[in-house]
């Protein structure tokens, strides 16, 4: 269809009233997101929708996080694909980034569009999931201890999350704190050095973010969280260079997908001794 023949679709900002329709669209595409995940993203990010005669047929989000903005849940209904709708949604999402560097996690289908808009690969994310066989937590250093976290630890969690991801996680984590089921951390010399969170997500639970100084710390935290939900379906999204994949496979969390990390500019870098071993979500980073 030529540009002159294309229908005049309506593009506008997403509102809370759009969330159920956006969720229904993702269900049609067999995406696992629950209504609550859509509502969270609508709270912490700027969303866009496209309609055809009042019917919601596409979405996209921009989530500002300091000097960066993550773009996610770029969806176009199957019967409307190939008409440039995804490209227009991406243009709106990029405009919402302002001066921030845009980053995203690209599916195989979406990668060519993002590459054409100036995005370049800088890594890969592996999606692991399944009914876990909770492993025995590995030993920590003698001067470290693992403990449940409370509201008093939230400032330190945000500090670590910012350093580990290179993003400003203040708004994202403050929203997550209200829905998290379990949050555990590793303390050394009276200071929080690492933490991980478990919450409802998709078909069961999700572990993330995981912020730690080493794979050993990350494994310990994940093992402790898995022990809290021994019969649950669990998902975790990890950088491919995290060193966790073989251990997760042994624990029953099989790799089911890989997506490309892409940036339109210099990608974020971890600061100091910690790094991010598991994402919040692929849409948020």
Regions found by a protein language model. Name each.
Residues 34-58, 70, 124, 175-185, ...:
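A short helix-loop-beta-strand connector motif used in the catalytic cores of GNAT acetyltransferases and
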Residues 101-105, 120-134, 255-267:
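Conserved catalytic-core motifs of GNAT/GCN5-like acyltransferases
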